[in-house]
Amino acid sequence: MSSVCDVCGKGPGFGMSVSHSHRRTRRRWNPNIQTVRAMVGRTPRRLNVCTSCLKAGKVTRG
């Protein structure tokens, strides 16, 4: 499943996991993407939307 929001374009953030001994390994933080049926124009479509867009009301479900 895609880890990019279809509404705002938010994607994963990249960085390092740092242990107590300060060994570092690459990791990524994915946004909380949900598949919802949303109205695009007059037709319902399945979109991958992040939860911050859902909470802000940027998507009309249908």
Swiss-Prot record:
GO MF terms listed in the record are: structural constituent of ribosome
**Official protein name in the record:** Large ribosomal subunit protein bL28
According to its record, what are the GO cellular component terms?
ribonucleoprotein complex; ribosome
**HAMAP family attached here?**
Ribosomal_bL28 (MF_00373)
Organism per entry: Parafrankia sp. (strain EAN1pec)
- Read off the Gene3D superfamilies from this record: Ribosomal protein L28/L24
Keywords, alphabetical: Ribonucleoprotein, Ribosomal protein
Source superkingdom:
Bacteria
Family the UniProt entry places it in: Belongs to the bacterial ribosomal protein bL28 family.
- Its signal peptide is none
Q: Which InterPro entries match?
A: Bacterial_rp_bL28 (IPR050096), Ribosomal_bL28 (IPR026569), Ribosomal_bL28/bL31-like_sf (IPR034704), Ribosomal_bL28_bact-type (IPR001383), Ribosomal_bL28_sf (IPR037147)
Listed GO biological process terms: translation
